[in-house]
Amino acid sequence: IAAMIGADLPVRPRKRIVYVFDCRDKPERAPLTIDPTGVWCRPEGATFIGGISPAESEDPDCTDFEIDYKLYEDVVWPTLAQRIPAFEALKLVRAWVGHYDYNTLDQNAILGPHPEVGNFYFANGFSGHGLQQSPAVGRAIAELIAYGEYRSLDLRRFGYERVAKNLP
């Protein structure tokens, strides 16, 4: 949509696979765990979810929504088993694929009005942080539209101007 008004955004899709798994001897208290390799996991109800956030140079092809089970078998599971011994015996329950809208400039959201096109507001490029930030961003953008300014949160630092000037 931004391209329709001539706005070139540094945002592209990045494919992410989330694996849902269970184990016999569940760790009693398991926090969000992120291994230096990018493999991560956390509790999700009675099961666990996990995956890998690879380096940008190792990103999987994002033109499909195919689940890479080999990635789970060869990378995710062995890394989790090394980090959390109870995960040596995991059972994969299901998996899904989605895309992040990844901001290649600075991995932060692009928020607020377009400086020249009236009634055009940005709220994209969250780079995987959208779910966590959406309540605050929704409120801030609503204030901006209703009152012409941010009131509860000043999010000007995430404005389109930094993108136009290529300033992370």
Regions from the language model: what does each represent?
Residues 9-15:
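Short hydrophobic/aromatic-enriched beta-strand-loop microsegments
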Residues 8, 22-119:
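Active-site lid/adjacent beta-loop-alpha segment flanking the redox-cofactor pocket in flavoenzymes
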Residues 15, 36-37, 127:
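Short acidic/glycine-enriched loop/turn segments that link adjacent beta-strands
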Residues 78-168:
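C-terminal catalytic lobe of FAD-dependent flavoproteins
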Residues 18-20:
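Sec-dependent N-terminal signal peptides of Gram-negative outer-membrane/periplasmic proteins
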Residues 1-7:
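Flavin (primarily FAD) binding-site architecture
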Residues 15-16, 158:
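Short linear loop/turn motifs
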